[in-house]
């Protein structure tokens, strides 16, 4: 009886090993399951302070928007729950990379506080990050038209971690409004993610004429 019992356990372990070994990490289904599960934790979250529920040690958010010859960067850092989130808005010349304008920002009690509100609205007219209004999950990605996908394991990666890339043609009205194009028009949209060794690190971007004109990254602070 003992031999029979251990035989069944051994067979079960073998089956599990074979199933794990057969996982196709490069498949669309696997990558969208991974990306959708992770991104849905954040997209969407209207109140930025609520992200502490996902990342108790803190997080950073970065956004870039290219308009004409200017590139606007918005950066916000959250280190401790209950304290103001602090950051900056900067405008750079896209060609020379020279800083043209800069001001500090804070996020307190569910709203932004700007050093110069009038100037901030000119630099950052949408006044919010994408994740505050954009919903992303596995089902939304599965319905989109996939352009390309790529998976890089840690042995081949220059950064030493697993990473993946997905590029779609997709309708995302929230993004279209920021880009100033018709909401029904599909856009080129990309997702770049890392494995759990670095915590939550995801980037999303929208491309126009093969140039990334809107980009956002959320990174978990790990201690």
What are these regions (language model features)?
Residues 1-22:
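Sec-dependent bacterial lipoprotein signal peptides
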Residues 16-64:
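N-terminal leader/targeting segments and the immediate start of mature chains
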Residues 51-53, 74-80, 104-106, 149-159, ...:
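Short, exposed beta-strand/loop patches in secreted or surface proteins that constitute
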Residues 62-66, 92, 167-175:
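Generic short beta-strand segments
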Residues 75-131:
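An acidic-aromatic
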Residues 164-223:
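Gly/Pro-enriched, hydrophobic low-complexity segments
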């Amino acid at each position: 009886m003992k031999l029979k019992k251990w035989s069944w356990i051994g067979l079960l372990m073998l089956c599990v090993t074979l199933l794990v070994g057969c996982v196709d990490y490069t498949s669309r289904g696997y990558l969208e399951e991974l990306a959708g599960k992770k991104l849905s934790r954040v997209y969407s979250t209207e109140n930025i302070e609520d992200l502490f529920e996902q990342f108790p040690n803190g997080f950073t958010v970065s956004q870039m928007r290219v308009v004409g010859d200017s590139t606007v960067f918005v950066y916000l850092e959250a280190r401790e729950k209950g304290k103001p989130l602090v950051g900056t808005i900067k405008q750079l010349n896209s060609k020379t990379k020279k800083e043209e304008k800069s001001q500090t920002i804070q996020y307190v009690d569910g709203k932004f506080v700007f050093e110069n509100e009038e100037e901030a609205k000119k630099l950052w007219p949408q006044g919010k990050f994408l994740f505050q209004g954009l919903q992303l999950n596995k089902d939304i990605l599965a319905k989109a038209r996939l352009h390309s996908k790529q998976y890089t394991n840690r042995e081949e990666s220059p950064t030493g971690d697993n990473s993946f890339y997905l590029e779609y043609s997709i309708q995302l009205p929230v993004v279209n409004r920021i880009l100033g194009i018709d909401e029904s028009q599909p856009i080129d949209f990309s997702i770049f993610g890392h494995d759990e060794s670095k915590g939550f690190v995801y980037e999303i971007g929208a491309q126009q004429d093969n140039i990334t004109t809107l980009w956002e990254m959320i990174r978990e602070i790990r201690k």
